[in-house]
Design a protein with these regions (language model features):
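A short beta-loop-alpha structural element at the N-terminal edge
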Residues: 2-17, 149-163
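Conserved donor-binding loop and adjoining core beta-sheet/short helix segment
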Residues: 7-10, 19-97, 204-205, 209-222
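Flexible, substrate/cofactor-facing loop regions flanked by secondary structure
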Residues: 35-37, 140-222
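Hydrophobic beta-strand residues of extracellular immunoglobulin-like
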Residues: 51-54, 198-201, 244
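Acyl-donor-binding surface of acyltransferase catalytic domains
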Residues: 61, 68-147, 286-290
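Conserved acetyl-CoA-binding loop-helix of GNAT-fold acetyltransferases
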Residues: 80-93, 226-229, 235-252, 257, ...
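Conserved GNAT acetyl-CoA-binding A-motif
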Residues: 94-108, 221, 250-262
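C-terminal "cap" of GNAT-fold acetyltransferases
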Residues: 130-149, 256-271, 277-292
Length: 292
């Protein structure tokens, strides 16, 4: 049996190396971003050692798990036995925190994690699609709905934007759990990928009716972190216009493509909207859920 203990910041480099190794083994490339890992750990604060664990064998780090307030679980392990030991700790802690469920996202090619969750009583719930849109073709101009104006994010907009996101996501996902506002603001804005000029806010008569939040372009790629439209504005082309506005903005900054992730079961029609806008799926992630 591996040694399981609480995670500390001294483990950071070894955990990132493990995540990178497991990603490359499953996908042939790495989709691990150390800065994202760092920000998730920072949000845990003093609870990191209680809500996150590492597995060690002969002094080598061979597994890691992170329990988040959103009732999501991150898991990486060299084999399913190590994964099971970490999962047992995570489930026990989740029950202590009165979580209603645990959700874990993994690619089908990650054999140790998929075997762990299947054996651990998780059910495959739905898929997340990763999609990309090339920007080297003719880009249509955005057509804004009558009466809607668009501007970049300002320092005083955080609470309104956060509320719009939470309302939109909770409106169709009964399991959605938002972050505390201070945690959300820290995760979203206090890092190098944040650029307020890439956060587009759509308003009607001063009311926020849509937003599209993007990360700064990296190595020629842009990223749509969040895009939502208030239910009162859906069906008028605002989502498409926000995307097209982003295409032109990214292209003007030299990006060659833009990507996003979307829940395949999103009932607002988002996956179909993205396909019509030129996005193509290149990776699928399964969401596994266990009710506690």
């Amino acid at each position: 049996m591996p040694e399981i203990r609480g995670t500390t910041w001294d483990d950071f480099d070894a955990v990132v190396e493990l995540l990178d190794t497991r990603s490359r083994k499953a996908l042939g490339t790495s989709d691990v971003e150390p800065e994202i890992v760092r920000r998730r750990w920072q949000l845990a604060g003093d609870d990191l050692v209680r809500d996150s664990w590492v597995a060690l064998e002969d002094g080598q780090l061979v597994g890691h798990a992170l329990l988040e307030p959103t009732q999501d679980l991150g898991l990486a392990a060299r084999d399913a036995g190590i994964g099971a030991a970490l999962l047992a700790r995570a489930i026990r802690r989740a029950r202590e925190r009165a979580f209603a469920r645990l959700a874990l996202t993994a690619v089908d090619e990650d054999d140790p994690v998929c075997e762990t969750v299947r054996n651990g009583g998780f059910a495959r719930d739905r898929e997340i699609l990763r999609m990309w849109r090339a920007l080297n073709t003719a880009l249509p101009e955005p057509r804004w709905p009558d009466g809607v104006t668009v501007r970049p994010y300002g320092d005083d907009d955080g609470e309104r934007v956060h509320a719009l996101l939470d309302d939109a996501y909770a409106g169709w996902d009964p399991d959605y759990i938002g972050r505390d506002h201070d945690d959300w603001l820290s995760f979203m804005t206090r890092h190098e990928e944040f650029d307020p000029d890439l956060w587009f806010l759509a308003e009607r008569a001063g009311a926020l009716v849509g937003c599209a939040l993007h990360w700064r372009e990296t190595e020629g790629s842009g990223w749509v972190k969040d895009i939502v439209v208030h239910e009162s504005e859906r069906g008028r082309g605002l989502g498409t216009a926000l995307l097209q506005h982003a295409f032109h903005t990214y292209a003007g900054r030299g990006a060659a493509r833009v990507g996003l992730k979307v829940d395949s079961t999103n009932p607002t029609g988002a996956p179909a909207l993205y396909e019509r806008a030129g996005f193509v799926t290149d990776q699928r992630y399964a969401i596994w859920v266990k009710r506690l």
